[in-house]
C-alpha cells in the first residue's frame, strides 16, 4: 500500500493519508480487470465467438472512495495486503457486484444461461456442462418488448409468483407463474407460460406474438430450468 500513498500527516491523535495517488491504480484495475459495463467475448454453443453488448448489469468495479478508506485503515493497522472485496460495487439488484471471484471464460465462469434470440433457444450450463437445452419464446421483436441483449444476472427466484405489468394498449395484466427468475430491473426473466399456444421459432416476430420481454418457457421444462439457475448466475442474451 505504501507506494501509492504520497502524503501522510498526524493531527489530534489521528493519521490522515492522501490516497489520491491510488486513483490511477484503481483506474488501471477497473480498465483491465473489472467487468461492469463492458462487453464480453463469449463462445456460443456451436463454438463461434461473439462480442456481447455492454448494456448488461453483470460485473463489478472498484469504488475509488471506498478503496481510499480501506487503504487508510490498512495502513493504520500496519498491514501489507488489503482485501478489495468490500470496495467493489455492481449494478441493479445486487449493488455489491457479481462475478468478482470469477476469472474463467472471460469473467463469465462455467455456470451460466445463454439465450440466442435468433434461434429462440436457451442453454443452461453447470460447471461447463450443458444440463438443459430448450426452445423458448422471447419478447416481441419491437423496441418496446424485445428482450434486451447483454450479460445480466439472476437477481432472485420465486415459486410461485404473480407477474404484473402493462399491455401494449395500456391495460394491466397479472399473470400467475410457477417459476420466476428475473434478470433485469425492467422486469425481464425466465418463467413458465402455461397460457401460450404458439411455441414456434417465429412467434416473437409476429405482432404481439412474443412476450413483454421475458423468456417464456414451456411448463414441461420451466421447473428444471428454475432449479438449474441460481442467484447471481450470469445470463447472456445475444
Q: What kind of region is each of these model predictions?
A:
Residues 1-175, 179, 229-231, 236-237:
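Surface-exposed, secretory/extracytoplasmic low-complexity segments enriched in Ser/Thr/Asn/Gly/Pro
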Residues 23-24, 38, 165-238:
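Exported/periplasmic cell-wall-interacting domains
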